[in-house]
Amino acid sequence: MNLLKRYAAPVACAAAVLVFAACSSTKDARRVPTPLTEFKPVLDVQQVWTASVGKGGRYSFSPVAVGDAVYVAGANGSVEKIDAKTGQQVWRTKIGSDLSAGVGSDGNLTAVGALKGGVFVLGPDGKQLWKATVQGEIFSPPLVGNGLVIVRTIDGQVIAFAAQTGEQKWTYRNRAVPLNLRVSAGMTFAGDAAVLAGFPGGGLVALNLQTGEPFWQTPVSFPKGVTEVERINDVTGAPTLVGAETCAVTFQGQLGCFDANSGRPLWEKPFSSRSGVAQDDTVVVGGDDWSVVSAYDVATGKALWRNDKLKSRDVGVPYLLGRAVVLGDYKGFVHFLSRDDGTFVARMKTDGSAIAAAPVLAGNTLVVLTQDGGVYGFRPR
């Protein structure tokens, strides 16, 4: 089925926590964050405003941009719409629950998720429109669009609600795995026919927006190893989609790109990421478990460049901005790399807390959200 042409398990969390503790421990000499080196900036980037929302706490919150507005949220229940041109607050709402995931918005409706399964949807003025509860923890931002609000739970459920009324439309349940990562794994619309989602166990699925049934499903990679920890093989981050090609990456697995209409594999490379990748019509870029950033030709998978100068700095999901690759690190630095060769072209500083989510572009303003709730607007010149 031509989707794009036709339409413009119980979680053993302790072990998963141990996996991340091992990966980020500075007591391991191999994991000591690489000191930043000086360089001559060749891209002029200006900080034009700053704002604040609630801290992320233990959870990773992602900003979302629609037009000239950016939507952000924090663990304390704060949800905010900001004018990205000025940094001024348009509206701010306090949800009466601690949040664990957000934000999703189509510019009209805005949705966030709570740890105990609460789904809160706000109208254009920021006032609560409806609330629903799902059975499971929500760590990934809801997806809003095509008349639906779609949420996913840590145990592999994807649930769709009617955007205006909150009526539950369908539920998809992925097969359970013995152990998975408690991390944000987003979703991506494929036109107005399907939604793409990756799952624990390494699977990538295109779900029918009308019914929740799979159009296709394919493995990004397969579990390897003997122990349950060694066999963790989750798709991390949101699947990317440009044209008819979608790419996804797994933890302890592979980076792969696929035909979005059929799920047919186009190419794959050994890779492991806890955050996700970025894609445009020429390259796919991501940081691996060691925070070594690599770029690949999107058509062939050929390696283009590799930058190990951010090794062990826990880089987040990249954003492709013109001729630059932009990503944050564990100390709140925003790094701009040349998309041609991966060298540094600019660097900006925030509040010193981690930047895990991808930056977003709202109008001509690049916006980043830190773990401490700092919202920063930058403009390259």
From Swiss-Prot:
Residues where lipid is bound covalently (S-diacylglycerol cysteine): C23
Stored SMART domains: PQQ
Pfam families: PQQ_2
PROSITE patterns: PROKAR_LIPOPROTEIN
TM annotation in the entry: none
Example GO BP: Gram-negative-bacterium-type cell outer membrane assembly
Signal peptide location: 1-22
Lipid-carrying residues in chain (N-palmitoyl cysteine): C23
Keywords assigned: Cell outer membrane, Lipoprotein, Membrane, Palmitate, Signal
Record InterPro entries: BamB, PQQ_b-propeller_rpt, PQQ_rpt_dom, Quinoprotein_ADH-like_sf, WD40/YVTN_repeat-like_dom_sf
Bilayer topology: Lipid-anchor
Gene3D superfamilies assigned: YVTN repeat-like/Quinoprotein amine dehydrogenase
Subcellular location: Cell outer membrane
One GO CC term, this protein: cell outer membrane
Quaternary state and interactors: Part of the Bam complex.
HAMAP family membership: OM_assembly_BamB
NCBIfam families named among the record's database cross-references: assembly_YfgL
Family label: Belongs to the BamB family.
Free-text function comment from the UniProt entry: Part of the outer membrane protein assembly complex, which is involved in assembly and insertion of beta-barrel proteins into the outer membrane.
Annotated protein name in UniProt: Outer membrane protein assembly factor BamB
Organism phylogeny: Bacteria, Pseudomonadati, Pseudomonadota, Betaproteobacteria, Burkholderiales
